[in-house]
From Swiss-Prot:
Transmembrane segments: none
Domain of life assignment: Bacteria
Full protein name: UPF0349 protein RBAM_029300
InterPro entries membership: DUF1450, UPF0349
Similarity section: Belongs to the UPF0349 family.
């Protein structure tokens, strides 16, 4: 089972699209996109994604990608 990375379409439009495109190239991740993840406050203040159900943020797409990989390393699924 791969880590699940979920993106909100509104946040993609705010800048996290680049992070999604980078992460989609990793065959060890399941990357999904939803209309809304109901984290509107978080969505307005930063780039974010849900990683296995937990919010991970970043100031830039590159920082978001780095933070996602760090989160996955620090929080193994098994």
């Amino acid at each position: 089972m791969n880590p699940m990375i979920e993106f909100c379409v509104s946040n993609l439009a705010r800048g996290s699209q680049e992070a999604l495109e980078i992460l989609e190239k990793d065959p060890n991740l399941d990357v999904l996109e939803y209309g809304c993840l109901s984290y509107c406050g978080k969505c307005m203040e930063s780039l974010f994604a849900l990683v296995n159900g937990e919010v991970v943020t970043g100031g830039t797409p590159a920082e978001l990608v780095d933070n996602i990989y760090t989160f996955i390393e620090e929080n193994p699924m098994f």
